[in-house]
Amino acid sequence: MQSHIGQWTSTAKGHLSRDENGDEKTDYSRWRLVDRQGRQTWRYLESDEENEKSPQTVPEKYFLGLDTGLPDLPKAETPLQAAQDGVSFLSQLQLSSGQWASECTGPMFILPCVIIAWYVTNTPIPPAYAIEIRRYLFARQRVEDGGWGWHVEARSSAIGTALNYVVLRLLGASKDDHRLIQARKLLHSYGGATYAPGIAKFWLCVLGVMKWECVNPFLPEFWLLPDSDPTAPSKWYIHTRTNFTSLSYIWSKQWSFAGDEVTKQLQTELYPEPYSAIDFAAHRTSLAEVDNNYPKWWLVNLMNWLTVAVYIPYMRKKATVESAEQRVWELIQAEDKNSEFIGLSPISKAANMIACYIHDGKDSESVRSHGETIFQYFWMNGEGMACNLSDGIQVWDTSLAVQAIAAAGGAGNPRFQSTVIKAHEFLEDHQLLDDVQDQEMCCRGHRKGGWPFSTKYQGYMISECTGEGLRSILQLQKTFQLDLKKRIPADRLHNAVDCLLNLQNDTGGFGVYEKRQGSLKLAWLEMGEFSGKTMVTYDYVECTTAVVSALASFSEFYPDYRKEEVQTARTRGLEFIKSSQKPYGGWHGAWGVCFTYAGMFALESLALAGETYSNSEPSRKGCTFLVSKQRDDGGWGESYLSFQKEEYIEHEDAQVVQTAWACLGLMHAEYPDKTPVKRGLKLIMSRQQSKGHWLQEQYEGGVGDGVISYSNYKLYWPVRALAEYVRRFGNEEM
């Protein structure tokens, strides 16, 4: 086991302490967030000399839950003062590259993929990381039953419990720890790890603690299908096809870790019966009821059975397998090259690393490159070390933060101009200036002119990020007080619009990464089990509103560029937004919780098209819906359960971020009574802290039916709502 956890290089182990649970804890004053042109990596300074030479910054202290040392501010009496106090705090968190770093965690099945990849490739796990990952997982363990869900708010399940139990054991936790005894008991009550969803079984097979017969096939031969085939992977949702590519390579090789003492012990711990007595093939379709949120269609089960019982033993030719594996390997190489070994997600990243280990060997350049970039996915907070859903959300956060600062007058305020200028420089630097190489071969859409979620190095364009990035640039470049040394020229802004226009689907809506490639009927092939909507590129209200709003802003500055096409795209987008409205007035969101989030963006898009409460039935219905959800304390509070129920579910408490969203939606729509907005802003101001910030409440974002933390939302959305109130109604005392 010790060969997998790296050695301390100094006397740093003497700096360790024990937390309230008796677990080892690192010295938080030694953690540093390295920012290399937007690439973020947490580093632990083991030597006293390093620690003294590199004092901890305000952002680092804040992320770690330490005292920032910032002064207390007088309690704000007006919305403008509250907004400016918020900007003051937010500006202190900007990193040297001009961006804002943040946590983007939530799903609990992602970290195990990365740790297993580290383990099976014999890549040393930094000891400080191992300690803090253990702390984070124990902090996220559910007290009532000892398990973990598939995301942090979810009920315990086989996927969360099996995978996170394994991670804790790989990182040195004892099987006799009372918390692991409780988790093991729960897992056995589900039937053991053989009752976990297919993706969990896959990673357990890679680790060598389950037999491959237990896993439904991941046939690389799918990649030999012509693009004309409606089920070809090129038609799938981009995350599913990218993950499938490297997973299918590993599955086809039937590769497993050779094993060590820990994995031998896990073979006995993960199951209620002896490992040698398990008929793994009989459990290929076994699934705990608690994980079966999206039952597979009978045709999918039939296809899997025919593949296992007929195709593989009798029809699968060696030459076909070799051709398929070669095609998949070329796609893996292209993905690594185009994303600079960062990958689309931690899952595809981890699987690509293992595929490179199998194909190129342990000491290869590809494995080394993966080992260097994998750190960009980890995030430290006060509870320990987690794994972000991506390598960061730098562009997304920076775009929205700078809009909030500008709304509060920061662009014209000498105190904050350097902050805004640095943010502009970051956004200018991270616009994608070309398409990927071998675009058609690797099934990538046009990205030139767009912006990514994180950085240009990762390189995946996202519609919302392109829309908000474009709006931010336009807003800043029109501010005459700013001395912008490197303005983005018109042709690059035109490229951004070209990129957006390429993304619109036949419905008028927009997806996340690309135009829909396949039929909506691909949803019949859903295999997510615990999470749904994994096969199809769907239209999303938030993506559509971001594009429609960006095109509206662009037309103000460049009214003649592709005038008819821009107007047509806006009109069709607005029609989609209206058609997506529920009969009772709400819009169902996907990437933020939920009706409150989508409602804000939808009402803004309608307003930019001249449709407000006074002249638009959709706007009136949207406002009436939002006002009906205001709580007695003046705030709004919506549970993430709205994702799954597809109806507004109340949270037990009002939420600052959702209150800001609701207030913004009402103000965008020019709701005639400012009383609900004023009540909401009073709640926001009452929760503002003495440094100018707001505390973390419920996770704000969404993925599938689960939650994601967008930890900067609580810092800039309230500012934006307060500033918008001042712009519309004046700076009255509250």
Curated annotation (Swiss-Prot):
Kindly tell me the pathway this chain contributes to: Secondary metabolite biosynthesis; terpenoid biosynthesis
Q: Which GO terms describe its molecular function?
A: lanosterol synthase activity
> Could you say which residues are annotated as the site Transition state stabilizer?
W396, F453, W591
Q: Which portions of the sequence form the region Disordered?
A: 1-26
Task: Report the SUPFAM superfamilies cross-referenced here.
Answer: Terpenoid cyclases/Protein prenyltransferases (SSF48239)
Give the compositionally biased regions (Polar residues): 1-12
One Pfam family of this chain: SQHop_cyclase_C
Gene Ontology cellular-component annotations: lipid droplet
PFTB repeat extents: 130-172, 493-534, 570-610, 619-668
| Recorded superkingdom | Eukaryota
Key words, A-Z: Isomerase, Repeat
Query: Composition bias, kind Basic and acidic residues: at what positions?
Result: 16-26
Top-tier EC class: isomerase
Q: Name one GO biological process term.
A: triterpenoid biosynthetic process
Per the UniProt entry, the Enzyme Commission number(s) are 5.4.99.-
> NCBIfam families from the entry?
squalene_cyclas
The function of this protein is:
Terpene cyclase/mutase; part of the gene cluster that mediates the biosynthesis of the meroterpenoids nectripenoids A and B, as well as cochliquninone D and isocochliquninone E. The pathway probably begins with the HR-PKS ntnH that catalyzes two chain-extension steps to form a reduced triketide, which then primes the SAT domain in the NR-PKS ntnG to initiate three more cycles of extension to give a linear hexaketide corresponding to the polyketide part of nectripenoids.
Which protein family is named in the record?
Answer: Belongs to the terpene cyclase/mutase family.
Could you identify this protein by its name?
Terpene cyclase/mutase ntnI
What is the species listed in this Swiss-Prot or TrEMBL entry? Nectria sp
Taxonomic lineage of the native organism: Eukaryota, Fungi, Dikarya, Ascomycota, Pezizomycotina
